[in-house]
Amino acid sequence: PERAYTRAQLLDQVWGDSLVYLNSKSTSWTDTSIQQGIGYEYQVLKSLPAFPTGEGGQNFGAGNIYSGIKIPPTHHRGACLVVIDRTYKNTLAFEISRLLDDLLYDGWIPDTVFVDKNDAADQVKNGILDWAKKNPDTHQALFLLGRIPVPYSGEIAPDGHNSDHRGAWPCDGYYGTIDGLWTDQTVKTTAAASSRNDNIPGDGKFDNKFFPSKVQLQIGRVDFSNMNKFSESEEQLLRRYLDKNHAWRIGKMQMMEQGLVDNNFPSSEEGLGQSGWKNFAAMFGISNVKDLQYRQTLSKQSFLWSYGCGGGGPESASDISSTTNFTTDSLLSIFTMLFGSYFGDWDYPNNFLRGAIASKTCLASTWGNRPNWFFQHMALGETIGYSTQLTMNN
């Protein structure tokens, strides 16, 4: 068979049996066995020639679609803890109060905890665990606002730069795991160019390079520390973010429902760019996914989602953009995926990923290919936190 469909409901842990096998000339298939009001996720597997390297095993292309008919709106999403840098408890009191209202109106039961930027990560996590135990909701989310202590873990170099970037990387997933053991006993590495990535026993950075359990809490961070390429202060950047976040939630920031992909690694066997193509096609339809230049296009035309990848440094991706550009640009995209070397380690000063959301428009950015992300559920009402948790646990 050239193409096979499997199906699962949202809370299912495994795929069901293949529903149908189609030949290479088929362009559509209708599932007649569904119920209205239920969302179904479909995985499409396409048979491809064997890989040119390795053992020549069977090769598949895979894509996902989340679909349903007359899906009811979600009125109760769960509980959300906003973990806030105590520095801004008073100066951003209005914006924080408004954020809590926005979360409430979006179906969350919001709560807050204030922490000091110099607290130990395990101290912060203990507060999160106490909250989680008191709120045994089906869905729980963390919104990290400000300079919340950054956990580091592993001896990794997912950008491939083993000679100068292998070591501990930022790991907010630590805050999202309720179960599982995090150790600080075995990894010993000081080879990276930055001492931030050093990891030695007993230094407070963890050994784990994989999550020791499922990530149970949805997680997002808004952190503008050490972003001095911007003329605005950290407090001003946080206020601007909360202002545009509110504007988006109440419908004052309108974007065309389409996706842009600018892939400067088109010949990569890894398929860099696939997180853009696969997600955007599932969300908007392939006719609404455009292969265009990132900065030049988004400065003039709006795309709800965008993807850009190119040779990277801590503050840029070649032929995409840079943190310096983000200080003045108002690119017309709310959600963006960016991929390149170094900046996936987002705790660099003036980091490119954080530069995107520090800009005047963008609300969310992710390192777009390692791992591949799954955002298709957002087109049917799920949150970006859900997609993040799903991706972390995949």
Name each model feature, range by range.
Residues 16-17, 30-32, 36-394:
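Cysteine-dependent hydrolase recognition
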Residues 1-2, 6-17:
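Extracellular low-complexity, O-glycosylation-prone stalks/linkers
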Residues 19-25:
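Short beta-strand segments within Ig-like beta-sandwich modules, predominantly Fibronectin type-III
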Residues 9, 28-30:
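Conserved beta-strand positions that form and line the central face of beta-propeller blades
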